[in-house]
Amino acid sequence: GNVTAKNKIIVLDSGHGGDDPGKIGVNQAKEKDVNLEIARKIKKGLEKKGWEVVMTREKDEMLGDPQAGNKKIHDMKARVEIINKTMPQAAVSIHQNSYQDEQIRGAQVFYYSHSEEGKRMAEQMQKALLTVDETNTRQAKANDTYYLLKRTEVPTIIVECGFLSNPEEAAKLTDTKYQKKMADAITKGIIACVEN
C-alpha cells in the first residue's frame, strides 16, 4: 500500500469488555481479558516498528452510552465509529473462539465477504499465525454478518486467537509468554498486510 508517515496508523479492537465478558474459558478465563492482553502486546510491537496504534478500548469497559437500552449495539457502533474516524491502514479485532466440542482448536481469521482487500489481509494473517502453531490447518474465512466487518470503511479483519473451550489452548491463551508469541505473529501479520 502507499503508506506515508502521516497515516501509519492501525486500529486494534479488543472484543467485548465491561459487562460483556465474551466467551468464558473451560479454565474460567474471560475472553474480554485475553483479548485486551494480546492487543496491548500487539500495540507495543507495532509502536516499536514506527506505527501509531489506536485502541478502541484500553481498559475493561463497554463502549458507547452505559445508560443505553441495548448496550451491545451501542458498544459495536462506538467501535465502528472509532475505526471510521481514525481511517487507519487497517483495523484488527482480537477475539477468542469457543465450541461445544472441546477438541476443536486453532486460530482463525475472518474477513468481510465483499472485501477483496479484507480477504487478502486475512489470508496473509492466517499464514502469519502458522509461526504460533504450524499444525493449524484452518483457512481464512469469509463472513457477511459480523457488524464490525460490514460497517467499517477500512480493511478490517477479526482474529480469533484460539478456542477457550479447548483446555490446552485456554491454558496457553492465559499464559503471558504464549500471548506474546501470538501478539508477535499478529504484529508481523499486520505489517506484512499493510506494507506490501
Regions found by a protein language model. Give the residues of each.
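Catalytic-core regions of hydrolytic enzymes
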Residues: G1-V11, H16-E123
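Active-site phosphate/pyrophosphate- and oxyanion-stabilizing loops and adjacent acidic/basic residues
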Residues: E81, K127, Y146
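Active-site/binding-pocket entry motifs
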Residues: G18, M62, T131, L164-S165
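Active-site-adjacent substrate-binding region
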Residues: G118-A142
